[in-house]
Design a protein with these regions (language model features):
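Ferredoxin-reductase
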Residues: 217-305, 352, 356-359, 384-386
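FNR/FR-type flavoprotein reductase catalytic core
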Residues: 3-13, 19-25, 44, 48-51, ...
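Membrane-interface interhelical loops and short amphipathic "cap" helices
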Residues: 25-38
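Structured alpha-helical
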Residues: 54
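N-terminal low-hydrophobic presequence detector
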Residues: 33-35, 265, 332
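Interfacial loop-to-helix transition and helix-capping segments at the boundaries
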Residues: 35-42, 49
Length: 399
């Protein structure tokens, strides 16, 4: 994560330096409106840069996942980049609007309008088209900004269900394209040919490609596999579904701790941790009833039911270089189930596994005990319905 943060700060620094280079007279100026123009451009370019990176991070590309060291970390970065872009967008909007409000209150004098390019008759081609398109670009940018606020607030609202959440992210790609068009038209003419111009155009091209890639439904397309339900078992005590699926085409394999998206007909894809090590074309999942999709899922299943699997993703690291303590709560035991399978063929330093649950699933606990014994893992099962919650003192005493 620190590597990604460092890279992002370097990019922000480069953008800042190139913007300063493109504004040679700004820092010696006392003209409020010259500063306003520079700040509007700078905040807009930075917001566009972050939005472009957020679009790229959402594509689940293998190269991006390697860079972020896991798609889960990538999505966390994606979230905070999106929030930062919105804050810069608000600064961009305020830098443009506040002087207008002060002029309307007669606290500022409206400056003479200078376009810096001479009479319109001297403009031709692209420059003339861009000038004529400015009013439309202003409207597009303003409404795109309002839409971005609404979509981001909705997507961050914890009470929102999964389908509306996915819809907001699909619409964000459309909003990005509108903001990109706004940026192309309104990027200051004085920047043309400068390094800041070409860097901004690069961000726009990359971000627009990512937005179109998403809108065309290409995200994860190369990692999708047809499959069917092989077996399933539901434990009412823990409200957990133990699902085994059979892939209908060769699976390229996965590492312990990775996850995949499951998509049933008429449903959106949902991510679940794979609860087994690589074992041919079968995958196992432990699914807790937590939301509108997972609640009652066992009642909608039948052996042979078709679904689509996308993955694997994630960079969960079961390092064997030092002793480890594994702690899994409820279905959070899934990656450690895969880890126990993995230890069947790997040598490791001592491992102590704590499994915390509320009301034990007898079948799952029996399986855990059997596998832990086979691979020499110390196992402690804590049922919070009868046992005290696990504490740091408990861990220190047992390990």
């Amino acid at each position: 994560m620190s590597r990604v943060k460092y890279t992002l700060w370097v990019v922000v620094g480069i953008v800042t330096l190139l913007w300063v280079q493109a504004e040679p007279t700004l820092f010696g100026s006392t003209n409020l409106f010259q500063w306003r123009s520079g700040l509007v451009q700078f905040s807009g370019i930075l917001a566009l840069m972050l939005m472009s990176l957020a679009m790229l991070l959402a594509l689940r590309l293998p190269s991006v996942e390697r860079w972020t060291r896991g798609i889960d970390k990538g999505y966390r970065i994606h979230k905070w980049i999106g929030i930062s872009a919105l804050l810069l967008g608000i600064l961009h909007w305020l830098a443009y609007q506040i002087p207008k409000w002060l002029i309307s209150l007669e606290l500022l004098t409206k400056p003479a309008r200078l376009n810096g390019s001479g009479p319109n008759s001297n403009l031709s081609g692209l420059a003339l088209w861009l000038k004529e398109a400015k009013p439309l670009a202003m409207e597009i940018g303003e409404w795109g900004f309002y839409a971005l606020i609404v979509l981001l607030v909705v997507s961050l609202w914890s009470a929102i269900k999964y389908k509306p959440f996915r819809l907001t992210h699909r619409l964000m790609a459309v909003v990005y394209l509108l903001i990109a068009l706004h940026s192309v038209i309104l990027l200051k003419k004085a920047y043309w040919g400068e390094p800041i111009y070409w860097l901004t155009m690069l961000f726009i091209v990359v971000g627009s490609w990512a937005a179109c890639y998403s809108l065309l439904g290409l995200v994860g397309r190369q990692s999708r596999y047809p499959a069917h339900v092989e077996a399933f078992h539901y434990c009412p005590n823990s409200q957990t579904l133990d699902l085994t699926i059979q892939l209908d085409k060769p699976w390229l394999g996965h590492k312990a701790g990775q996850f995949a998206y499951l998509k049933f007909a008429g449903e959106e894809p949902h991510p679940f941790t794979i609860a087994c090590a690589h074992q041919g074309s079968q995958l196992r999942f432990l699914i807790k009833e937590l939301g509108d999709f997972t609640t009652g899922l066992h009642q909608r299943l039948q052996n042979g039911k078709s679904l689509e699997v996308e993955g694997p993703y994630g960079k969960f690291d079961f390092s064997t270089q030092q002793p480890q303590i594994w702690i899994g709560g409820g279905v959070g035991i899934a990656p450690f189930m895969a880890g126990l399978d993995w230890l069947m063929t790997e040598r490791a330093h001592p491992v102590h596994l704590f499994f915390c649950c509320h009301q034990i699933d007898p079948n799952l606990c029996a399986e855990l005990r059997h596998k832990a014994q086979l691979v020499g893992v110390s196992l402690t099962i804590i049922d919070s319905s009868v046992d005290p919650h696990l504490s740091a003192d408990d861990i220190a005493r047992r390990c």
